[in-house]
Amino acid sequence: MRAFKVTRDTNETKIHLELNIDGTGKYAITTGIAFFDHVLSSFAKHGAFDLKLDVLGDLEIDDHHTVEDVGIVLGKAFENMEKKNIKRFGWAIIPMDEAKATVSIDIGGRPYVVGGYTPNTEKIGNFSTENVVHFFESFSNNAKINLHFEVTGENEHHKVEALFKAFGVAMDMATQVDERKGIVSTKGVI
């Protein structure tokens, strides 16, 4: 079983995460940011990851540190995963009403993010939309994953939710075990 626990305790956040990559999509997420909980739940459900996340952040300031540090901790959990026999690449195109999100991933040990997301509104509830790209940067840098994404649409809720669903589906695909694969790199290491 590929299950990991990661804790982060700083002056800005206190986070405890439990991730089972080979889960069934069960989740219990409490970040203090309702919409962020919602999209992380969508990530877990559509990625079939069991995810438990308890966060106490400095939300009296704003949501930046909480969103950033969740990306860091989730990234570290995936970085701990054994890379031998994984499919390595994953992608998804997910519609949600008028919105469409595309995500492609390479679990190749090289963090890099190319993101096409321009928010039409500053907030969805108490979630700052400017933090969407920052979440994916924090995740990628700590998971050492190359991540490309694009999203179009009018409704901000639909755009961000479609993006997190696509992220879950693509990560599920890339983390699947295929015993034929070995290390999927001509270098022999990831």
Swiss-Prot record:
GO biological process: L-histidine biosynthetic process
Lineage of the organism: Archaea, Methanobacteriati, Methanobacteriota, Methanomada group, Methanococci
Name listed for the protein in its UniProt record: Imidazoleglycerol-phosphate dehydratase
Source organism (scientific name): Methanococcus maripaludis (strain C6 / ATCC BAA-1332)
Keyword Iron: no
Gene: hisB
Entry-linked NCBIfam families: PRK00951.2-1, PRK00951.2-3, PRK00951.2-4
Membrane spanning stretches: none
Subcellular location as annotated: Cytoplasm
One GO CC term on file: cytoplasm
Enzymatic reactions: D-erythro-1-(imidazol-4-yl)glycerol 3-phosphate = 3-(imidazol-4-yl)-2-oxopropyl phosphate + H2O
EC number of this enzyme: 4.2.1.19
Family according to the record: Belongs to the imidazoleglycerol-phosphate dehydratase family.
UniProt-listed Pfam families: IGPD
Molecular function in Gene Ontology: imidazoleglycerol-phosphate dehydratase activity
Keyword terms: Amino-acid biosynthesis, Cytoplasm, Histidine biosynthesis, Lyase
Pathway: Amino-acid biosynthesis; L-histidine biosynthesis; L-histidine from 5-phospho-alpha-D-ribose 1-diphosphate: step 6/9
Enzyme superclass (EC): lyase
